[in-house]
């Protein structure tokens, strides 16, 4: 099971859509069923705390015109990884460590997401589209 070692994130944004899920719903093989995600409209000027027990997609714009967002992360988050870390092997994550894309940043991608080949593509189900 994925553990959460970092703190919450704080987001203050223009109107945007935030797609969230629960860390507890990640399967033993680190896959995640996208049907468990929920989309929320966040009105402009609203502060949102995304708890460390949450999964989230990158925020999405509402009107196709883009948006601005300020995200406050725990110190060191998204810094380059230091030391040796496990890698995705033949499409499988041998451990949680293989999901680390940067310091304090675990990544589970979708096959349609355009991620680098070495990324773990464990999002199972429909690639969510907020325009529908």
What are these regions (language model features)?
Residues 1-7, 11-12:
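Single conserved hydrophobic/aromatic residue that forms the stacking wall/gate
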Residues 8-9, 30-32, 59-61:
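Short histidine-centered beta-strand/loop micro-motifs
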Residues 16-40, 82:
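A short beta-strand-loop-beta hairpin characteristic of the jelly-roll/cupin
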